[in-house]
Amino acid sequence: MRVAVLADIHGNLPALDAVLRDVAAAGVDAIVLDGDIADGPMPGPTLDRLAQLGDQVIWVRGNSDRDLAAAFDGTFQPSGLATNAPAEYYAWCAARISQAHRDLLAGLPLTVSLDIDGLGAVAFCHGTARDDNEFILVDSPVEHYRAAFAELAEPTVVVGHTHMPFDRLADGRRVINPGSVGLGYGHPGASWALLGPDVVLRRTLYDTDAAAAALEAAAPDLPDIGFLAGNVRASASDAEALAAFTETARQQAPKGGAAD
């Protein structure tokens, strides 16, 4: 099996459409959605677009997918982490999805395992196999990698969540992040990955000015729309993003843990 991995779309339908054109040209067997799929300026249309692909799509739950379903149910609880969106943001998104969308998101698995050509068994999760909101960074200590994936047998793991692509060997396990389709850091365009027979980190360029304008038009009253559209036009630097996520990882770690 050869797959495309798309993570952190965050309701950016113009970016998704651009990536799907490249994915179609690549000729894959399946598309793995590695979490944080719909929340953002175009939540309903993004889910509808992906649903049109039918059984070709394999879905994995991200923290924002879980939070969006909870907001729809009226049970959302903020995490308190600076890098997670506030309740007002999820309330706006939840008002723009259907019951069927909610049921889809609420039923997504935390992890999926697939047999990939040339790589063997590969596990897919958004944060880690134990927590969809846990941050794995390219420079996280090896001890953090070991603990985060201890329950997995697969020698290769694909994660998302940090929006920054990397391919690292840690504690004998290959860990890959495809980056973000909808809200990348460090460069313009949309990041994703091809798996099989090896790993290729891909970037799709698209008209980010037109996309940002479309997002603003679709969601003028979405909390944080200025940040979201602005980041599509000119992405924050990877150094800025890494610093923010490193601080969040430090907040998440138990006292005396590896991220301290």
What spans do the regions from the language model cover?
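Active-site environment of divalent metal-dependent phosphoester hydrolases
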Residues: H10-A15, D39-M42, S64-A69, D132, ...
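Hydrophobic/aromatic beta-strand patches that form the interior of the parallel beta-sheet core
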Residues: V32, I58-V60, V158, R174-I176, ...
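Glycine-rich phosphate-binding loop signature in dinucleotide/nucleotide-binding domains
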Residues: V23-G27, L53, I116-G118, E151-A153, ...
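Beta-strand-turn-beta hairpins that frame and shape the catalytic cleft
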Residues: M1-V3, L114-A123, A170-R174
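Core catalytic region of metal-dependent phosphoesterases/phosphodiesterases
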Residues: R2-R102, A106
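Anionic-ligand binding region
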Residues: D139-I176
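Acidic, His/Gly-rich catalytic cores of divalent-metal-dependent hydrolytic chemistry
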Residues: L169-D260
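Active-site-proximal segments of metal-dependent phosphoesterases and phosphodiesterases across multiple
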Residues: T75-N84, G118-E151
